[in-house]
């Protein structure tokens, strides 16, 4: 079964991170990711969402977009918080950023109009 792009929009609350983690884990499993890669991606989404929620205290919603690629998954997380202070100073040297970089194949801070976000790439390897 082909995995289509998925979009999940939830209120910007930390108690909903488990829902984001479950969705990304399910889609990664359907794409044939190994258990370790699924766990890395699940933890990366949790870390990225926590990072965004901490930086955007004025956020009212958190958006997760997952798109399959020929080599894995592209994951975009964003909030509707004002972007004037995004990215936070030193964000690319923070512990959260180091964790994201270790768990994914690519992590990028994104500013796009009225949103602030993160773009993550996780390449798949056959489960086994």
Predicted segments, located by residue:
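Bergerat-fold GHKL ATPase/HATPase_c domain
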Residues: 1-43
């Amino acid at each position: 079964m082909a995995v289509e792009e998925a979009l999940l929009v939830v209120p910007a609350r930390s108690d909903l991170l488990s829902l984001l983690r479950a969705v990304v884990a399910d889609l990664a499993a359907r794409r044939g990711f190994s258990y370790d890669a699924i766990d890395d991606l699940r933890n990366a989404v949790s870390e990225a969402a926590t990072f965004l929620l901490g930086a955007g205290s004025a956020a009212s919603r958190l958006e997760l977009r997952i798109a399959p690629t020929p080599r894995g998954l592209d994951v975009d997380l964003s909030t509707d918080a004002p972007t004037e202070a995004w990215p936070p100073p030193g964000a690319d040297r923070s512990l959260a950023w180091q964790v994201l970089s270790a768990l994914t194949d690519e992590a990028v801070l994104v500013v796009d109009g009225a949103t602030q976000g993160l773009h993550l790439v996780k390449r798949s390897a056959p489960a086994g």
